[in-house]
Amino acid sequence: MAENQEVYDVTIIGGGPIGLFTAFYCGMRELKTKVIEFLPKLGGKVSLFFPEKIIRDIGGIPGIAGKQLIEQLKEQAATFDPDIVLNQRVTGFERLDDGTIVLTGSEGEKHYTRTVILACGMGTLEVNEFDSEDAARYAGKNLHYGVEKLDAFKDKRVVISGGGDTAVDWANELEPIAASVAVVHRREEFGGMESSVTKMKQSSVRVLTPYRLEQLNGDEERIKSVTVCHTESSQREDIEIDELIINHGFKIDLGPMKEWGLEIEEGRVKADRHMRTNLPGVFVAGDAAFYESKLRLIAGGFTEGPTAVNSAKAYLDPKAENMAMYSTHHKKLVHK
């Protein structure tokens, strides 16, 4: 290791909601912290794809827009001044003789740390684009893979293709403001929360199941209508639209982390109840983690992050108490 090289107590890979809250809790445990984020801004997939989505699965918060949640998490994380590195993918992992971990960035940057917490979701995300020659031409015009501003869809005829929780949530959010909303899903059953699906079906949203999006019809600039096809009868229908939203999931890749020697199960990093991985000094939290009865909610990740931090603290200092630290009495927060 080079002389005078700065070594961090914890380096968090991932600057999404879980990474940000984990950084805050590292400060609570007086750990020198760095956060490395692959994207050019903090917030992970919430900032990238769901800034306008209302998040309702956090205790004490009836509902909050994704972008607002990220702003509050950034403010909270900044309490203890963690170092933030953006627009950098971690590609290399090695351990020096003294136990220091060296993380290598995509451009050869070196990051020295005593422990690592993986809060990178399921890896890098790339939307599954609609398989059509015309899709690229209309993307960014009136074909969307995310909803950045709800108001952009006000008084518009909107078709949403997809059946997961995000597609259902978008339908419910847009229904009060759009001229019309139709949801096209290739299966009869939806993957969203039961209450959200019920709300959608009881609203004015037109639900077409089991149908698939087949064709985009338009001119050089915009889609004018879409053709949908019944998956069983092959019956087709053209629907006139102003805006098309496609939510067909993501391509997810753990990338180079798969080569680090981590135990992987179902595309995630296997963890014990202390959020420890099989590699000493490496911990995991949020969607990146796999263990039995894992709860895939932001609220669950907000518990796993502090658990990983406490385990990292105990790894660095076996005499340290492996317990929750109450922010109520923390000297840096008590006068806020």
Please state what every model-predicted region is:
Residues 28-47, 182-191:
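Glycine-rich FAD pyrophosphate-binding loop
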Residues 1-13, 28-29, 41, 83-156, ...:
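FAD-binding core/adjacent interface of flavoenzyme oxidoreductases
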Residues 8-34, 170-175:
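N-terminal Rossmann-like FAD-binding beta1-loop-alpha1 element of flavoenzymes
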Residues 154-177:
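Rossmann-like NAD(P)H-binding beta-loop-alpha module
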Residues 131-152, 243-299, 303, 307-314:
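FAD-site-proximal beta/loop scaffold in flavoenzymes
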Residues 12, 16-18, 41, 124, ...:
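Residue-level detector of alpha-helix initiation sites
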Residues 6, 74-105, 110-113, 175-271, ...:
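A Rossmann-like FAD-binding core segment of flavoenzymes
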Residues 40-64, 193-196, 201:
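Conserved N-terminal glycine-rich FAD pyrophosphate-binding loop of Rossmann-like flavoproteins
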